[in-house]
């Protein structure tokens, strides 16, 4: 059903396909009734691997996302499929957030060092993890880029990984990983900005084999900001970090979490405060409701979590985030996370 919806045939259905091959730079599908057909939109087929008469992979583009139809005769799934299809690999998450935040990833200096080490491994392309499953040792590595042959005979390549963002902490937190001359913990958001950006120079300066950004950018999500003044502070912090690391202005891109009341009601002003950097906005149910609880705590008993999700104000909050993002020109240029 998916193939019939994403890449429909001129006639017939992919369910009745017996074979796929490339003839004269076009995909030809032979059906079980002996007829041959092609794609209703031929431009959706962009390349392949293997032999033209018997490809091992077919690469398609649909709604600006890619997917690969794979053929492997040794696979049990392929052996039960008339055309020998073994799997379909989908390009799904466009972006992935690596988290340095206190609530989920790092609560002290030791945790923070681990988070930085993982971010370093991701930017160097060397991160791996070995674990035991079903009595066997298994190792997970970062996915390599996917190479394929374009229809004109030239080489094509698809990213094997989604675009990585790194979430720093908000402005309030401090951390004992670094102490100042008076033995005070340093502001954790400043520490995160400097160290995660420094680590990201492996990618910016192309000192790695698995590239994250194709444009030499670093993508940082800033959470828990209360209004445009705090966004402006983050923007100035990014200016200072770029100067410290000798990075071109606006190398550090900003994702703004719309999860505090003053940000929600001033979202346009928040976006304006980082207008040269902003690449992402998103909502956050727990932080946003938490701010509402702290703001209105004396007004009476709050609704329970499950009931809050059904309230009109939560729907209005989510809708407003999308509406403001679109009104500010995000379509086709920046991400509205949902």
Residue ranges and their predicted role:
Residues 238-249, 261-338:
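Active-site capping/gating regions of soluble enzymes
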Residues 252-258:
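Aromatic-lined carbohydrate-recognition surfaces of secreted/lumenal glycan-active proteins
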Residues 1-233, 240-247, 253:
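Catalytic alpha/beta active-site cores
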Residues 223-227, 258-263:
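Short, internal active-site loops enriched in acidic
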């Amino acid at each position: 059903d998916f193939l019939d919806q994403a890449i429909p045939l001129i006639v017939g259905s992919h369910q009745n396909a017996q074979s796929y091959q490339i003839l004269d730079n076009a995909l030809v599908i032979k059906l079980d009734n002996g007829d041959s057909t092609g794609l209703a939109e031929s431009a959706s087929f962009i390349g392949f691997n293997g032999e033209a008469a018997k490809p091992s992979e077919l690469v398609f583009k649909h709604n600006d996302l890619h997917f690969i139809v794979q053929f492997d005769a040794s696979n049990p799934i392929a052996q039960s499929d008339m055309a020998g299809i073994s799997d379909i690999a989908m390009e799904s998450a466009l972006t992935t957030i690596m988290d340095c935040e206190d609530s989920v990833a790092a609560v002290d200096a030791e945790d923070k060092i681990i988070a930085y080490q993982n971010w370093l491994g991701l930017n160097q392309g060397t991160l791996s993890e070995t674990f035991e499953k079903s009595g066997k040792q298994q190792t997970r590595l970062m996915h390599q880029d996917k190479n394929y042959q374009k229809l004109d005979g030239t080489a094509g390549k698809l990213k094997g990984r989604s675009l990585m963002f790194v979430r720093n902490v908000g402005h309030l937190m401090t951390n004992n990983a670094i102490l100042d001359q008076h033995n005070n913990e340093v502001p954790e958001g400043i520490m995160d900005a400097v160290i995660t950006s420094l680590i990201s120079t492996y990618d910016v300066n192309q000192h790695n084999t698995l590239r994250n950004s194709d444009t030499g950018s670093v993508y940082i999500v800033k959470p828990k900001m209360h209004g445009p003044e705090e966004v402006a502070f983050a923007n100035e912090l990014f200016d200072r970090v770029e100067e410290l690391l000798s990075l071109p202005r606006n190398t550090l891109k900003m994702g703004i979490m719309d999860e505090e009341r003053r940000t929600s009601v001033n979202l346009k002003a928040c976006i304006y405060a980082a207008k040269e950097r902003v690449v992402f906005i998103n909502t956050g149910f727990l932080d946003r409701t938490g701010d509402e609880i702290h703001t209105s705590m004396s007004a009476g008993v709050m609704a329970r979590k499950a009931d809050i999700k059904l309230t009109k104000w939560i729907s209005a909050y989510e809708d407003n985030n999308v509406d403001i993002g679109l009104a500010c020109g995000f379509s086709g240029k920046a991400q509205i996370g949902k």
